[in-house]
Amino acid sequence: MWQFIRSRILTVIIFIGAAHGLLVVGPKFIRANQEYTLVISNFNSQLSKVDLLLKLEGETDNGLSVLNVTKMVDVRRNMNRMINFNMPEDLTAGNYKITIDGQRGFSFHKEAELVYLSKSISGLIQVDKPVFKPGDTVNFRVIVLDTELKPPARVKSVYVTIRDPQRNVIRKWSTAKLYAGVFESDLQIAPTPMLGVWNISVEVEGEELVSKTFEVKEYVLSTFDVQVMPSVIPLEEHQAVNLTIEANYHFGKPVQGVAKVELYLDDDKLKLKKELTVYGKGQVELRFDNFAMDADQQDVPVKVSFVEQYTNRTVVKQSQITVYRYAYRVELIKESPQFRPGLPFKCALQFTHHDGTPAKGISGKVEVSDVRFETTTTSDNDGLIKLELQPSEGTEQLSIHFNAVDGFFFYEDVNKVETVTDAYIKLELKSPIKRNKLMRFMVTCTERMTFFVYYVMSKGNIIDAGFMRPNKQPKYLLQLNATEKMIPRAKILIATVAGRTVVYDFADLDFQELRNNFDLSIDEQEIKPGRQIELSMSGRPGAYVGLAAYDKALLLFNKNHDLFWEDIGQVFDGFHAINENEFDIFHSLGLFARTLDDILFDSANEKTGRNALQSGKPIGKLVSYRTNFQESWLWKNVSIGRSGSRKLIEVVPDTTTSWYLTGFSIDPVYGLGIIKKPIQFTTVQPFYIVENLPYSIKRGEAVVLQFTLFNNLGAEYIADVTLYNVANQTEFVGRPNTDLSYTKSVSVPPKVGVPISFLIKARKLGEMAVRVKASIMLGHETDALEKVIRVMPESLVQPRMDTRFFCFDDHKNQTFPINLDINKKADSGSTKIEFRLNPNLLTTVIKNLDHLLGVPTGCGEQNMVKFVPNILVLDYLHAIGSKEQHLIDKATNLLRQGYQNQMRYRQTDGSFGLWETTNGSVFLTAFVGTSMQTAVKYISDIDAAMVEKALDWLASKQHFSGRFDKAGAEYHKEMQGGLRNGVALTSYVLMALLENDIAKAKHAEVIQKGMTYLSNQFGSINNAYDLSIATYAMMLNGHTMKEEALNKLIDMSFIDADKNERFWNTTNPIETTAYALLSFVMAEKYTDGIPVMNWLVNQRYVTGSFPSTQDTFVGLKALTKMAEKISPSRNDYTVQLKYKKSAKYFKINSEQIDVENFVDIPEDTKKLEINVGGIGFGLLEVVYQFNLNLVNFENRFQLDLEKQNTGSDYELRLKVCASYIPQLTDRRSNMALIEVTLPSGYVVDRNPISEQTKVNPIQKTEIRYGGTSVVLYYDNMGSERNCFTLTAYRRFKVALKRPAYVVVYDYYNTNLNAIKVYEVDKQNLCEICDEEDCPAEC
């Protein structure tokens, strides 16, 4: 439908010059690579034609000519002439003007300045969601358009950057190529990114084109929404707010629950609180206590927390409810902005209620002092008090006052117009507007017209013009064809000369469509979850189409992520908009006049009000389990077919909700097309299940699994609900152990949620599938869903790994016996044993790159475990010439995520700190700086200036002696401690600078000064840890003492001849040994390095990592560098595995460098024997684990737990106190972590910690595993008591609860720890079971 709207703004600026019967009209703006059209009208009755010379010229500010175009034209009497100029592509900013000179005796000279517009392209960004969780993928599209909303031919690529909330560059595409004006890509958000508002920006030729934000946060997508609105308009005299609360699922059905309403007044203090039960809709009255307003209206904050019945899911809505002093408002409606002295002026006072309805019966006195007008009157049924005022010739201003009997007061001033004539012309639309159909306009003038000229303007230029001769009539029917060139918006201007004055009128045409008439529709508005939906598209053949669909619930966060019709209008207006001035219509139209003294321009062309005109507007069927619960989907690109249409069939997700579907299209010729508004459809079933399952449970506990049934069929039915025992993972309490399913029946009335539950125990650890099916009407209506909950061990898991490494340069045969160390007190049935054969040293590491360490990684140093190993793996894969592209891609993607994570810890001075808001650390900045520099060769996102600034900060921290001392908290004593002359930290910083070629050159003096300090300290270094790092630094520097240092280091080592192992027995043996191995590699002592490598390999964890982050970093680095020298490309060997009375064989060749072989071993196995024969390289790994109760640990921390009385069965308050037990007085631990695990059924909210001690503050709190575990980080701990209180809430029913535990440990020396168990309420089965589930004793 096309709409015609009268407007005061003309977005195409034009100029008019009229003289000697000549009218010259043209755009005032010029752009590069765009047509410029001038229209000259000859209404001179004396001359049959005029000859003119047109000159378009421009120069830069320094006088350099950039444009000089001339044209000779003639214009015949009573005709128009359209002259086109093509602006060059390379037009630049400057001073431009157009000159019109008469020729061949015709005296005429006019010139006008033109304004150069540099903006010739614009951009849009579409994101698939407004908000993302850590670990999500952000899909986005960039759309680039020219002034005609088409893909710009000259722009082939754009520069796209994504930044985190601290403006760190996380990802960039320096040459993002456009296809049909579109660039599409995605960003994998890291699992622990910086939360907050992120930014996508697009640049073209160094200037920002467009940007858009999205949010990264932890959130749960609500299944329902709550609306809070006044039941009646609140007035001060009511002294109350009456609210209506509506709660509906996104698919339209009402929600049952409890609404908690809180009213705040005066500095946001809680004044009133009420609760009410709501089923879909409810009302509540909140009364004030002497509420007095200072203004005519005041916002009152109201908070509504709606808790869904049965599930306890909660939606919180905070609203500002406006209270008014009076029941109505008033506006002055004028026939024109200004009045004409001596002529009647019509206006009206429009009274409306605050809901927009007319306010009739409002009485009061109207006074207009300037014309001595006074009356007492009442508003009519339309809320109007109509006035006709008679200003005299001398009236300068009308001051209109209204005083109501209830004290309401209003006034407004109206100014007179500076008039030059009483004549006017008017343009009115008289027909609907349709593409390629005639538009009918009525042109009316107060004088008989001999001619008038019309101009059609769109997209910054005049696209049509005409010279009409009405034969001296005051009215004329103008008919114009609505062409595609006018789309999407155009303006029509008419002008004539009446009484030596140019009078004019204009109209805006808003087509409400685009030249690319793209359309999108679906075959059903309601569809069952998981079923297929058909999309029908029509548009220009071959055009690009971008589709997106997302859960309507996401709009509760924001809706700016998507593209809408209104966005396209804003882009179009952005090219052509100018400022409005309601009192200077020529200014608003972009007009200026060039006339002789006897031809004037009318300054008031609005004689009547400009009102908008709207014209012409089966039984036994296979049950599908719902498992796909995406929040956004259908992010897809397609092309329109040759026929101009395209159909697409897609499967909708399994979520029961409402969806928004949007689509746009781009054609190179016809430009952009987009649907008018998003298509909304609902995935709903007449009968369905909603689950409310816990995140995790412990094995052996009795747990209630809660479901809710909904019936929308209009009648009550008996439902059969079946819970399945999938893979024998589940035990139904009170039922035979052999049952594979359990069915219950329940009556389900229409439109009411009916709860049903099952009491179960989990038999096996790991992920347990919960599969449930419900049916009514003998199976004609069914629903089924499957979800996974985690089954945790009742004891602590004890992982173990025995590794044997072999490297045969020639054919050999060797046997490796392995005895398993399984504790005799291990829980029965908990032992798992696996044999792995890896022909590649890093196969296990690559497999576990995304979870190398089992401990938390919530600080700036620990977080690097998500970054550095990926670099080492990529180095290794490239060094051995791996062709496994999927492994390279995995490591590269994880490297990008690790980079994202690490940027959270960057400080404003360029350094990196342990926490997000803290001082920079010398140790960590050195570590991050050198790692980032190395990573640049694999990801281009890293900002070189950022790395340089970090290393500059590092260099600035050097002591005049050459040493480096710690800055920031001490959390790694061996590295940061200053008791041994800072040798370790100084060596570490030098190592970072030496491994960075740019820093090595830039900070050569710093390096030289540091190496001098190390060489001066060399004689006194008697700690193997210090010496290992110093030796590696000397190797990197090529120092003259490097060989002496290595020999001294070797002398400090320990040798296990039976295992062919060499290591250094310090407080940090893995780091020390790894640095030593790096020095062996640098010295090319590969044979001597094999025993060192053997020992390191045998210290690895199951994931291929080492106990802590620094162990892992330097350990993997050393093994990688060594492995690069021992290529598996010559592998050709056979492996025989013997255990008990069984044997397995493996044949390995050089083609299998990335293949892992494994065998599950019976749990009662105590020893294995492995024989290897052949040539090559490999790792033999026996991975096993068992569960052990938490008893008899030797505590190195004091740990105290106290359960506090809350007076509620649903709230747990646990006071935790911990302190370090030093072996020497006043010594402190390294970084200390406290992990609190909660009993099954309990979870924490977002801010669970209170009452913490201040002496040694908590640096970070991390909520894990769905709120069932909380980790607290301390810089370190001493003998002081470090206390806090944790609050958790029971959300699920669990009986036979296993004890929970709290553990505190030193992060860099996990042998220093303490652990305590605690228990909460002793619920038994009889307290939580339904009658039919309860055992006989209940």
UniProtKB/Swiss-Prot annotation:
**According to the record, what induces this protein's expression?**
By parasite P.berghei infection; expression picks 24 hours post infection and increases again 4 days post infection.
Tell me the compartments it is located in.
Secreted
Its chief place of residence is: secreted
GO BP terms in the entry: defense response to symbiont; immune system process; positive regulation of melanin biosynthetic process
In the UniProt record for this chain, what is stated about the effect of gene disruption?
In RNAi-mediated knockdown females infected with parasite P.berghei, causes an increase in the number of parasite oocysts in the midgut and a loss of ookinete melanization.
Q: Which Pfam families match?
A: A2M, A2M_BRD, A2M_recep, MG2, MG3, MG4, TED_complement, TEP1_CUB2
Glycan attachment residues as annotated in the record: N68, N199, N242, N312, N481, N637, N728, N813, N919, N1065
Q: Which Gene3D superfamilies match?
A: 1.50.10.20, 2.20.130.20, 2.60.120.1540, 2.60.40.1930, 2.60.40.1940, 2.60.40.2950, Alpha-macroglobulin, receptor-binding domain, Immunoglobulins
Keywords recorded for this protein, A-Z: Disulfide bond, Glycoprotein, Immunity, Secreted, Signal, Thioester bond
Query: What span is annotated as the signal peptide, if there is one?
Result: 1-21
Q: Does the keyword Ion transport apply?
A: no
- Region annotated May contain the cleavage site sits at 580-609
The highest taxon in the source lineage is: Eukaryota
Q: Name one GO molecular function term.
A: endopeptidase inhibitor activity
According to the UniProt record, what happens if one changes C859A? In absence of LRIM1/APL1C, increases the rate of hydrolysis of the thioester bond in vitro
Q: Which cysteines are joined by disulfide bonds?
A: C1217-C1283, C1326-C1338, C1329-C1334
Q: Does the keyword Lyase apply?
A: no
Where on this protein does the Isoglutamyl cysteine thioester (Cys-Gln) crosslink form? Answer: C859-Q862
**PTM (free text):** In the hemolymph, the full-length protein is cleaved by an unknow protease into a 75kDa N-terminal (TEP1-N) chain and an 80kDa C-terminal (TEP1-C) chain which remain non-covalently linked. The TEP1-C chain contains the thioester bond which covalently binds to the pathogen surface. Cleavage is induced by bacterial infection or aseptic wound injury. During embryonic and pupal development, the cleaved form is the predominant form.
Cellular component terms, GO, for this chain's entry? extracellular space
InterPro entries with a match to the protein in the record:
A-macroglobulin_rcpt-bd, A-macroglobulin_rcpt-bd_sf, A2M/Complement_sys, A2M_N_BRD, A2M_TED, Alpha-macroglob_thiol-ester_cl, Alpha-macroglobulin_TED, Ig-like_fold
Phenotype when changing N312D: In absence of LRIM1/APL1C, does not affect the rate of hydrolysis of the thioester bond in vitro
Assembly with partners or alone = Heterodimer of a TEP1-N chain and an TEP1-C chain non-covalently linked. Forms a complex composed of TEP1-N and TEP1-C heterodimer, LRIM1 and APL1C; the interaction stabilizes TEP1-N and TEP1-C heterodimer, prevents its binding to tissues while circulating in the hemolymph and protects the thioester bond from hydrolysis. Mature TEP1 and to a lesser extent full-length TEP1 interact with SPCLIP1; the interaction is induced by microbial infection.
- What's this protein's name? Thioester-containing protein 1 allele R1
What is the species of this protein?
A: Anopheles gambiae (African malaria mosquito)
Q: Which gene encodes it?
A: TEP1
